[in-house]
A protein has these predicted regions:
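H-loop/switch region of ABC-family ATPase nucleotide-binding domains
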Residues: 212-213
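Conserved ABC ATPase signature
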Residues: 127, 152-156
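H-loop (His-switch) and adjacent beta-strand-loop-beta switch element
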Residues: 225-238
């Protein structure tokens, strides 16, 4: 079997939230919150710390649940109820938080294979056949990390680890690639390399949701921007109209000057 991006899998919107209320422990995070992420639309969710971005990701991954009431609903890929393992087969998630979840002796290949089960390692009850292993090798080749497959994950550079987490997210050909602050902790060289890879994937048809508080890691291929602040959508629409000095100054409560060059954005003190 040859690994390839299936551009035609998504039949429904990625997520549809209607008038939801969400608590984390005893703290109400979302109240009467609504949002829809559409199929095939590369989207950035941008906001300061504490805006609700992480909560939104946890809803997408079903790590959190809404308060059930008559007027609220949540649908993921058109369905209200999911088997958790089946849902996560539709998603590929890359987050810098995952890097510390793997044991010190985990090899690069094992990190990639764990993507078939959306687990933080491989376990005895998990079965991997020759097709799984071949797909893992193909994705590692695509990302240029095949020669690191037998190295311990803990000994790799941050940039190398992030590429293996990307391979883990892609190996099962998910319908949506979710990037949670993907360049956090990377130096400039690794950051630019990583963004180039993401751009290539989007040009191949990968549907991306990017969650960040940095405008500089928003690739040109992103078309929609959603601004979150204090767990509310304060702006939503075409990226070029949303990512302006005026809107981002209001979002981050300080004067900001936005510069755009070669399709990328840069934020400077206003």
């Amino acid at each position: 079997m040859i690994w390839a991006i299936n551009r035609n899998k998504i039949l429904k919107n990625i997520i549809e939230l209607q008038n939801i209320t969400v608590f984390q422990q005893r703290n109400k995070v979302f109240d009467n919150f609504s949002l829809s992420l559409e199929k095939g639309q590369n989207t950035v969710i941008l906001g300061p710390n504490g805006a609700g971005k992480t909560t939104l990701l946890k809803l997408l991954n079903r790590e959190l649940y809404i308060v059930e009431n008559e007027n609220s609903s949540i649908k993921l890929f058109g369905k209200g109820r999911w088997n958790l393992q089946e849902l996560r087969a539709h998603l590929g998630v890359v987050s810098h938080h995952l890097q510390s979840n793997y044991s010190n002796n985990a090899l690069g290949l094992y990190v990639v294979l764990s993507g078939f089960y959306a687990s933080d390692g491989i376990w005895q009850h998990q079965n991997f056949d020759t097709e799984h292993i071949e797909l893992a090798h193909q994705v590692m080749n695509l990302l240029g990390i095949e020669d690191l497959k037998s190295r311990q994950f803990s000994t790799m550079s941050t940039g190398e680890q992030r590429k293996f987490l990307l391979a883990r997210a892609l190996v099962h050909d998910p319908e949506v690639l979710v990037l949670d602050e993907p360049t956090s902790g990377l130096d400039l060289r690794a950051c630019f390399q990583y963004l180039e890879i993401i751009q290539d994937l989007m040009s191949m048809g990968t549907n991306v949701i990017l969650v960040t508080h940095h405008v500089n890691e928003i690739p040109p291929e992103i078309t929609r921007a959603i601004l979150l602040k204090e767990a509310k959508v304060v702006d939503d629409g075409d990226k070029a109209k949303i990512l302006t000095s005026k809107t981002l100054s209001k979002l981050f409560d300080r004067p900001i000057k936005i510069i755009k060059e070669n399709g990328f954005y840069q934020a400077l003190p206003g």
